[in-house]
Amino acid sequence: MTRSGDEAQLMTGVTGDLAGTELGLTPSLTKNAGVPTTDQPQKGKDFTSDQEVRWCPGCGDYVILNTIRNFLPELGLRRENIVFISGIGCSSRFPYYLETYGFHSIHGRAPAIATGLALAREDLSVWVVTGDGDALSIGGNHLIHALRRNINVTILLFNNRIYGLTKGQYSPTSEVGKVTKSTPMGSLDHPFNPVSLALGAEATFVGRALDSDRNGLTEVLRAAAQHRGAALVEILQDCPIFNDGSFDALRKEGAEERVIKVRHGEPIVFGANGEYCVVKSGFGLEVAKTADVAIDEIIVHDAQVDDPAYAFALSRLSDQNLDHTVLGIFRHISRPTYDDAARSQVVAARNAAPSGTAALQSLLHGRDTWTVD
């Protein structure tokens, strides 16, 4: 099969125009560029739906819900242009309780649905609410590909280290040795570190917060909501029925020696009196006593390092016992988003392509042809 000279020239022109297009690779827009705003004052109650909240008493989801409700007015966006998409699990009831649009979708597929919505509707602020089971088990592939593509969505991953809705089985973040209904002799699985996973997928924004730390949670959410691109926020939260006290070590006596709060541009020191710090150790990082190191050896947190290796090393400081758990923003860099590039590519193709049969034939023929004798 051969292609006529006119068709070959036509196809070359189309693809040449596409190759020379910037395809939206200008990562200077804000998260909600193109999303309609409102000049009407908003309060937390404006984002409260008429649905009865059906979580167990004491569930950490209540704190997160109230924090989100009180935070959303800061964005100044029309409620009709905010969408929360969830999968399956206790956390996935979230869209019912917000006076915005939402999807309560299927297990693990919220990032895929959010990807399509972000591509199709630039006028929407798209959020994903998921849990450790929903996101990291059946939804693992959807999550990492949304992150690596840098889709313009904000993903909230509620991590209670247990399957709550299905009544207490171990999850992908449960500790080794976790005794549950499905692991009566203790879990053998090595758990995922959600922050490490997101950084491995090269997410452009990765943060972690504790449900009971309202100020810290709001600070991370505020930054994630303004970040254009894929933003993942892991929220450590309690399940009082099936995994009660899972994160008590980060709340009770001695928490100052376990929690490391990081802020961009500030030295990483912690402890009741700043007696501990983070320093370099070989190819990674380690905790040292502040009195034992020179001041210039203490790491100054830089969330804007392009290489994710530094943020990854920071995420590896903690273990399943929660010693040296880092809270705050690990990584916050700028990179072109997939949805911006895709929309620009569509515009370029429409502008470059001729109409009629010739255009269809040029696409069917492709760029390379062979003659078969």
From Swiss-Prot:
Organism of derivation: Mycobacterium tuberculosis (strain ATCC 25618 / H37Rv)
Species classification: Bacteria, Bacillati, Actinomycetota, Actinomycetes, Mycobacteriales
GO cellular component terms listed in the entry, alphabetical order: cytosol; peptidoglycan-based cell wall
Miscellaneous section: Is extremely stable under aerobic conditions.
UniProt-listed Pfam families: TPP_enzyme_C
Region ranges (Disordered): 26-50
Subunit note: KG oxidoreductase (KOR) is composed of KorA and KorB subunits.
Magnesium found in the keyword field: yes
Cofactor(s) the protein needs: Mg(2+)
SUPFAM superfamilies registered for this protein in UniProt: Thiamin diphosphate-binding fold (THDP-binding)
Catalytic activity field: 2 oxidized [2Fe-2S]-[ferredoxin] + 2-oxoglutarate + CoA = succinyl-CoA + 2 reduced [2Fe-2S]-[ferredoxin] + CO2 + H(+)
Protein name: 2-oxoglutarate oxidoreductase subunit KorB
Gene Ontology annotations of biological process type: tricarboxylic acid cycle
Keyword field: Magnesium, Oxidoreductase, Tricarboxylic acid cycle
Annotated gene: korB
Amino acid composition bias (Polar residues), ranges on this chain: 27-41
UniProt GO MF annotations: 2-oxoglutarate synthase activity; magnesium ion binding; oxidoreductase activity; thiamine pyrophosphate binding
